[in-house]
């Protein structure tokens, strides 16, 4: 193993240990000492890569963004999938995204300065264009008619990424579910029913789990 591979392996040990501890104990209760002991990495090594646990969670946020961007691109560009299948693939990804769920449960937005701004910018720059591709596919295939796919994609990103984020809002589960239903109703009203009944059921379950886990 060369030096670059050793460095990568050490960094991953630290991140994996931090992820497990954040999940088990919570961000606030986890110390750098805890992470050092769980990872088996020396004090000098851990501080070589991360000056604080805030830097660790900041890295986790950026890493999660990269994974999300890549997965959205893969789904949007998969010509073998229908619009409904692509939406289902997106939902499945978020359900199974362990790193994202850890960040949500630890209220990531309170931990890193400007994290929300960076997340919104990332979503508009990388994720919205992929959502727009799926909407355009639906129009081309005759599933629905949408004259403003790019604009609708950006609106949906803001609604799901900010308006419905359980970390940002402090609404009850009932209030959150009502807003979800409003989004689905709004899409139906403008003639762009992106979400099937099956997908709507899965999304509602996902948000209920997110709200009860934080």
Model features per residue range: what roles?
Residues 1-25, 29-41, 54-58:
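Basic, helix-initiating cap at the start of DNA-binding domains
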Residues 44:
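Key DNA-contact positions within bacterial/archaeal DNA-binding proteins
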Residues 58-64:
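Alpha-helical DNA-contacting segments of helix-turn-helix folds
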Residues 59, 73-101, 153-156:
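Hydrophobic alpha-helical connector segments
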Residues 84-88, 122-123, 136-155, 173-178:
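All-alpha amphipathic helical-bundle segments outside canonical DNA-binding/catalytic cores
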Residues 95, 99-144, 150:
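Short secondary-structure transition hinges
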Residues 129, 133-140, 169, 173-214:
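C-terminal peripheral helix-coil segments that are non-catalytic and often amphipathic
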